Amino acid sequence: MGNELQHRTVLLDEAVDALVTRPDGVYVDGTFGRGGHSRAVLARLSDAGRLIAFDKDPRAIETASGIEDARFEIVHDSFAAMKGALDARGVGRVSGVLLDLGVSSPQVDDPERGFSFRANGPLDMRMDPTRGESAAEWLARASVQELTEVIRDYGEERFAFQIAKAIVARRAESDRLGPLDSTGELAQIVGHVVKTREKGKDPATRTFQAIRIHVNQELADLQVVLEAALSLLEQGGRLVVISFHSLEDRIVKRFLQTHASAPAVDRRLPIRAVDLPSPPLKLLGRMFPSDAEVAANPRARSAVMRIAERVAP
């Protein structure tokens, strides 16, 4: 219950205002979390409306099971499975797709989930602890090269190679020290390597982000769900995406810009602009949390919401 109360949905009203254009439409919440956005969407829908939500986290599924509403359905799966799940339900087109990326406060604040370096816990980091390889399992087998690439590319950490070497060196001591399987020890290893300090940021922040993204295939799944959302949106349907770090936002921005731009054509070819296919999306801008929201919920500070509408059939 405590974690439920601590979670504050970011850009709640702004996201739902941007998403819901038809009260009788079919909508998708790709990241149910603790249900803030889903409940707000349901409040905007008529009796004919429908909301299908996705989440990998069993605790999110447990929370969603408490919503007794015939218009609502929860799917225990990654949003990357959206297209197949909707096809199986006979849903070919939707009026809107909402994606609220990253981890939720209850996940971060629960030491047992292994997402945070602030309290010691098992080194897990899986959105769904019942599926896939944990962070500890991956760290126990990854090479220096693989560790370096993940920490550098997903954490934008300039000390990635040194951190990777330190992790592998610690692994060599497993017979004497036991496995590297706690968030506290990983944070300590990183802290010994990263001597510089970014204002307001723990030295382990980038490494933990990188490992979490890798373990959960977050960026690959994001690319898949963006393509799925584009194929599912009806004309006039909205795609609303809330990102919390530059890697996510870069992918979202590039995808939206690509599909909102006319195809490039060699000017020397005898082709008129009117003969070219219209881009499927129209960009409706981006939004940031207000100063008041950030003051009430500091974790909202890095959020950016991008909105696009399908304009082509």
Curated annotation (Swiss-Prot):
Single annotated GO MF: rRNA (cytosine-N4-)-methyltransferase activity
Root EC class: transferase
Protein localization: Cytoplasm
Record's keyword annotation contains Methyltransferase: yes
Pfam families to which the protein is assigned, alphabetical: Methyltransf_5
Binding residues for S-adenosyl-L-methionine: 35-37, 55, 79, 100, 107
Reactions listed under catalytic activity: cytidine(1402) in 16S rRNA + S-adenosyl-L-methionine = N(4)-methylcytidine(1402) in 16S rRNA + S-adenosyl-L-homocysteine + H(+)
Signal peptide: none
Main localization (coarse): cytoplasm
InterPro entries: RsmH (IPR002903), SAM-dep_MeTrfase_MraW_recog (IPR023397), SAM-dependent_MTases_sf (IPR029063)
EC number: 2.1.1.199
Biological process according to GO: rRNA base methylation
Keyword Transferase: yes
Keywords from the named record: Cytoplasm, Methyltransferase, rRNA processing, S-adenosyl-L-methionine, Transferase
GO terms under cellular component: cytoplasm
Origin superkingdom: Bacteria
Role, per record: Specifically methylates the N4 position of cytidine in position 1402 (C1402) of 16S rRNA.
PANTHER family in the record: 12S RRNA N4-METHYLCYTIDINE METHYLTRANSFERASE, S-ADENOSYL-METHYLTRANSFERASE MRAW
UniProt record similarity statement: Belongs to the methyltransferase superfamily. RsmH family.
Protein known as: Ribosomal RNA small subunit methyltransferase H
Gene it is expressed from: rsmH
